[in-house]
């Protein structure tokens, strides 16, 4: 018979923990109200063999509104978010390990040879790859006021400034591994290769 290989079992973790923390403070003092929020998210990726596969996010928000007098109310708020995704840098988007995980037949070998040398297969590509990352940052500031002219008329003004940045760090993976695309040559115990003729004779 033939040995069957389970690529999903070799590459995908059975579980991936997520940690989330949120803190919110709000209150009012006189004619001034405020709200402060802080958040942290840490998610582990599903890759079993990658050096790093996770996602982290930090976010914060603050808002203040104050009625200075019966004619003027001012307000200000701000939001900040920092997201960072780390993942195995395969360097190939058209035929990455996730594609081959389901494309390859269960007969394709995974792991190492009988001599302990790694094979070129999806799980080893992830293990041998460098860690790439994608970081997104977002910043937003709002300023405004309300001017009460009469009992039934008021003027509202709001100004918003925001900025978003995205930074990607990628690398080229270099590794040595045995090819599985070609018919392997068997070995006998003393380390010599085994060759057979057309009649199957050694």
Language-model-detected regions and their locations in the chain:
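Transmembrane beta-barrel domains of outer membrane proteins
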Residues: 24-28, 63-65, 144-146, 158
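Surface-exposed loop/interface segments of Gram-negative outer-membrane beta-barrel transport/assembly proteins
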Residues: 1-3, 41, 45-53, 59-138, ...
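Short, Φ-rich (hydrophobic/aromatic) sequence segments
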Residues: 143-145, 149, 153
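Hydrophobic, lipid-facing positions within transmembrane beta-strands of outer-membrane proteins
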Residues: 19-23, 58-62, 139-143
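Outer-membrane beta-barrel channels and translocator barrels
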Residues: 18, 29-30, 65-71, 148-150
């Amino acid at each position: 018979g033939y040995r069957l290989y389970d690529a999903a079992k070799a590459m995908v973790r059975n579980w991936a923990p997520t940690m989330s923390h949120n803190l919110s403070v709000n209150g009012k003092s006189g004619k001034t109200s405020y709200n402060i929020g802080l958040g942290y998210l840490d998610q582990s990726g599903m890759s079993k063999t990658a050096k790093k596969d996770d996602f982290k996010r930090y976010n914060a928000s603050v808002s203040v509104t104050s009625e200075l007098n019966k004619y003027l109310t001012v307000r200000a708020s701000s939001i900040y978010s920092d997201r960072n995704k780390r993942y195995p840098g395969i360097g190939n988007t058209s035929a990455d390990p996730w594609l081959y995980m389901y494309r390859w037949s269960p007969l394709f070998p995974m792991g190492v040879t009988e001599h302990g040398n790694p094979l070129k297969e999806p799980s080893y590509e992830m293990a041998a790859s460098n860690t790439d990352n994608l970081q997104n940052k977002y910043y937003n500031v709002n300023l405004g006021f309300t001017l009460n002219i009469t009992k039934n008329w008021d003027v509202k003004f709001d100004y918003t400034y925001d900025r978003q940045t995205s930074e990607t760090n990628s690398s080229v993976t270099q590794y040595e591994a045995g090819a599985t695309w070609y018919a392997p040559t068997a070995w006998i115990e003393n380390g010599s290769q085994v060759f057979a003729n057309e009649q199957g004779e050694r």
